Structure formats: structure tokens, C-alpha cells
Design a protein with these regions (language model features):
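Short small/polar-residue motifs
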Residues: 36-47, 109-118, 176-185, 232-240, ...
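Short, low-complexity cationic-aromatic patches
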Residues: 46-52, 123-127, 186-193, 244-247, ...
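Ser/Thr-centered flexible coil motifs
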Residues: 19-22, 161, 283
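Extended intrinsically disordered, low-complexity coil regions enriched in Ser, Thr, Gly, Ala
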Residues: 61-91, 142-163, 204-222, 266-281, ...
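An N-terminal, globular interaction/scaffold subdomain
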Residues: 1-120
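Extended, well-ordered protein cores
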Residues: 97-202, 206-219, 228-233
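C-terminal structured domains
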Residues: 206-378
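Extracellular/lumenal glycan-associated surfaces
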Residues: 56-62, 131-139, 191-206, 250-259, ...
């Protein structure tokens, strides 16, 4: 059995409806996943209003699960994962970024909590798949512009073009009180040489003024009716803008629920998806498949089904620790573009965590490997 990410996806496959991801599309995702380390957070982007069951693959790299070390070039001494051997210029820059991010005490290590790679998959993937790349800030990060520029210069291999930098600064300065940048993306796979800004802290009330200030080339009448119907059913909105010399027409609004990893809120997700179904943005079969995806998986009764590295870790931790896979809906995104009908996408998450019994304190601990390992210490 593989020690790569495809082993995790294989465990999730029985719970992933072919209405969302066809067997052929899943095979294409697996071709990419078997080249990547077993990151503890990955998932699928599914289009809800189209009958085609296609999906893109997302993978989150973190320090805690060792995936950051693999990207940095120090976590794969045996060369098990092909990303360590990719010679494409984009991957060479990604590894340079990973090495800087992995330096203890560096500004990137302090500011950036994780990175997210998104692979667009339309058919059989290229032998060397090229992802879009997102840096996601720590909660307490300063979000300093200089750090953003340093990160993007590493990724692009050159500083931001002056016109792009000027427009990015204008978008950040135009944020209302409470608004902040949560992530910044370099869209390598789409050959867009600008920046994607992911912004939190906006609301249906502050969004029209913000989009007007930054020069979005659309009218609020194109998105306000749908957002007004959706907003009461979500906890938080996030905005994604593609920023080059100008703000690009394509606009994304993410809809999040404030649910915990311990318990999924399928009722509220169902209510949100029903609103989209009523407006023709979500097929009924896909709505049902999304709700059915949500759940969890552990293999205490079948440890032989675990990927080898999890089996080894589980045996080393002993009988009081258990690897768990959570299946969640991370968020739903509404996409608006002037002159086009809106589109809805769902982002499914597959999250690997550990459940440990802290016998000293008489409680259970649910978290990453280091957290659970610490709870088991005598």
C-alpha cells in the first residue's frame, strides 16, 4: 500500500458519490495524489450546478504533519515523493519557498501558518502537474506588506510588477474596519501573473462600498440578490479577488459555517444548499451527495487497512491513540462575473487527526500528532 496522499484518498473513496466525482475523475486526482506526501488536510473542489462530475484537488502543507519538511527538501531523504524530483521551474521555486518557510525563527515561519496547493484537473493530468499556490497567514500574523512581497517574489522568481503592487496596496488600504487579508495566491496553473487576495471581515453591508472603492468592473445588482438570500444561513463570508494592473472581473464569495471538527452541522449545510438548489445553482443529486459525504472514519477494527506510516505510528503510540479521518464541507463558494450567471462550488475537506486518551487528566485529546503524543507522555 502507498505511503503517499493517494492512500488517504482511497480510504475516502467509498464515501465520495460519483455524482460529485466520477470514477474517471477520481482516477485523475489519484494520479496527482500519489506524487505527494500524506498531508493531513486535503480535499476536492466540486462544481454544483453542472452535471459533469469533475473535481480539482487541494492539498494543505503544514509543519505538524511533516509535509512542510517534504516541500523544503529535508523530509524525503529517500525520494519517495515525486514532487522532490520535479524539475519544472515552478516546482523549483516552490521548494525554495518551502526551504525559507521551514527556517526556524524566519519571518515566513512566524507569519505563515500553512500553504495550500490547488491542482486544476480537467482530464488526464500532466506528468508534472502545476498547481496554484496560496500562503495562509497565522491568526496573529502582522500581515506586513513586505513579508507578502518577499513570499510572492520567491514564488514568481521576481518582485511584483509595480502596477500590480500598486493595485494590491490599494485593495488592502480600502478594507473596512475589521477586514484583513487571510491568504494570498499565485495562480500558476492559470497563467495569471497577478495576485489572488483572500479577504475576511467583510459583510453584505460593507461589500458594495468596498468593491466600488477598489474598482471591481461589475454592478452590485449582479450579486446582491443571491447574497442576501444566502447570508442569513452562514456564519462568515470571505472574498477572493484577482488583482493585476486592475481588479479582474471574476469575484468569489466564500460561505463558511462556524462548525467544529468534532461535530458536523449537516442541517445548516443542507439549508444553505437548498437555497442554491432553488435558484438553479446546485443540482439535487449533488446536494444530497454533499450531505452524505460528511462523517468520520477510524479503523481500530481493521488496522491492516491503514496506510503503512499511520499503522507504524499507531503501533508506536499504543492502544490509547487512534488515527481518525474527518470528512467535512469546508465552504461553499459563489462565483460572480459581469455578464455571466453566478456559479456555486463546494470545497470538501478530508482531515486526518488523532484521538488520544490522556489518562493522567482523565480526558480525551483530539488534535494533531504532536498534541496527542504529548497527552500520552507519562
Amino acid at each position: 500500500m502507498s505511503n503517499a496522499l493517494d492512500a488517504y484518498l482511497r480510504l475516502a473513496a467509498p464515501h465520495l458519490s460519483p455524482e460529485l466525482v466520477s470514477p474517471e475523475a477520481f482516477g485523475n486526482l489519484q494520479r496527482i495524489a500519489r506524487q505527494l506526501p500524506p498531508a493531513s488536510a486535503s480535499g476536492f473542489e466540486c462544481r454544483l450546478g453542472q452535471p459533469q462530475a469533475l473535481a480539482d484537488l487541494g492539498v494543505r502543507f503544514l509543519a505538524a504533519d511533516g509535509s512542510r519538511a517534504v516541500l523544503a527538501g529535508r523530509g524525503d531523504p529517500e525520494g519517495r515523493f515525486e514532487l522532490s524530483r520535479f524539475t519544472h521551474p515552478v516546482w523549483e521555486r516552490l521548494r525554495r519557498f518551502g526551504a525559507r518557510w521551514d527556517e526556524p525563527g524566519s519571518r515566513l515561519a512566524r507569519e505563515i501558518g500553512d500553504i495550500f496547493l490547488e491542482f486544476d484537473v480537467e482530464g488526464t493530468p500532466e506528468q508534472v502537474p502545476i498547481p496554484s499556490f496560496f500562503i495562509e497567514y497565522e491568526r496573529r500574523a502582522t500581515r506586513d506588506l513586505e513579508i507578502m512581497e518577499d513570499a510572492l517574489a520567491l514564488l514568481w522568481g521576481e518582485p511584483l510588477a509595480p502596477t500590480v503592487r500598486e493595485r494590491v496596496v490599494a485593495c488592502l488600504e480600502a478594507l473596512p474596519s475589521g477586514g484583513e487579508v487571510s491568504a494570498v495566491g499565485a495562480m500558476f496553473s492559470r497563467r495569471f501573473e497577478g495576485v489572488r487576495l483572500c479577504l475576511h471581515g467583510l459583510s453584505p453591508e460593507t461589500l458594495p462600498g468596498y468593491l466600488e472603492r477598489v474598482g471591481w468592473p461589475g454592478a452590485s445588482a449582479e450579486w446582491e440578490p443571491l447574497l442576501s438570500a444566502v447570508a442569513p444561513r452562514v456564519e462568515r463570508l470571505a472574498l477572493s479577488l484577482d488583482v493585476g494592473g486592475t481588479v479582474q472581473p471574476r469575484l468569489g464569495v466564500e460561505c463558511h459555517l462556524a462548525e467544529s471538527l468534532h461535530e458536523a452541522d449537516t442541517a445548516r449545510w443542507s439549508a444553505l444548499l437548498e437555497v442554491l438548489e432553488e435558484r438553479g445553482l446546485c443540482l439535487p443529486t449533488k446536494r444530497r451527495a454533499l450531505v452524505d459525504w460528511v462523517g468520520h472514519l477510524h479503523l481500530r477494527a481493521r488496522p491492516e487497512a491503514l496506510p503503512p506510516h499511520l499503522r507504524t505510528l499507531s503501533a508506536a503510540l499504543g492502544p490509547h491513540a487512534l488515527p481518525v479521518f474527518l470528512r467535512r464541507i469546508n465552504h461553499v463558494k459563489l462565483v460572480f462575473q459581469p455578464g455571466h450567471p453566478p456559479e456555486a462550488k463546494a470545497y470538501l475537506a478530508l482531515i486526518q487527526r488523532w484521538l488520544g486518551q490522556d489518562r493522567r487528566r482523565g480526558r480525551y485529546v483530539f488534535g494533531d500528532l504532536d498534541e496527542v503524543r504529548a497527552s500520552l507522555a507519562p
